[in-house]
Amino acid sequence: PTEIEPFGGAATCLGGAIRDPLSGRTYVYQAMRITGAADPTKPLNQTLKGKLPQRKIVTEAAHGYSSYGNQIGLATGYVKELYHPGYVAKRMEIGAVMAAAPRKNVIRETSDPGDVIILLGGRTGRDGIGGATGSSKVHTEASIEVCGAEVQKGNAPTERKIQRMFRRPEVSRLIKKCNDFGAGGVSVAIGELADGLLIDLDKVPKKYAGLDGTELAISESQERMAVVVDPKDVDTFLGYAKEENLEAVTVATVTESPRLVLTWRGKTIVDLSRAFLDTNGAHQETDVTLEVPNHEGTPFEKKEVGDVKEKWLKMLGSLNVCSQKGLVEMFDSSIGASTV
């Protein structure tokens, strides 16, 4: 995603990293960012066809990640960018977070027939459709022009509200199971919560009109959570969401029949057995040949150093040893330090 739309791709890198532990009801306290790029000082005319210039990717991605982290109020304690020609084909964008919560506040139970599933947070749009497959498929020179919609659009303030809400013990203890909306959207985030499900796509809040059932089912719009609660706790949970100015609606129920059923405009558009879904697709095998590592020319091999001054100056001229102070200072590393 960062190769195609650097700002949004890097922002959702951090947003997704925060949502993963958040679905486990843990609060994220710290983040780190390690990236890899080719030489951003290369002239524009040396850019590979069908790719953005490295300088554009490097600067916009840093803006995207830091913008999301600074808005949500997450301390980014370590930032490092590595430069190597191997990253000219595909950039490396790694975001990692550290999260924790009191064990007594985290409830993990099975979904029972009759339980209600609430969709919490952001609205659903066309952004992110195909993002899961897009990050793994083979891209071509045309990807930069036609795959922009696969990149999700983050909304840090909304995710901050979910963080604040889930941090409250009285809220966290109402949640039996929870999934964040990542790859696959409604069909996966809700589809994984129980063996039998009846999902009403008409109830899914939309960013705008015109979305069909397929788009509602697979959109990967950001800042959404699927929460399983007992029927008697639904009104209480919706009340807590309203206090945080979060949109929350009931969109599905757990059923006894082990089937995933999605309805749209009064019609059933998906009806799949859980046994089929649990096969995870066709069984695949492949043959692998491992090559023995070449021990010659390794970084640990002792070499004769000729002109020490020349080697020293060459090393100092490397992008990997230059100061990254300007990059690091884009990220707030102390936010929350004085919060009790």
Regions found by a protein language model. Give the residues of each.
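Glycine/proline-enriched, intrinsically flexible loops and inter-domain linkers
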Residues: 1-340
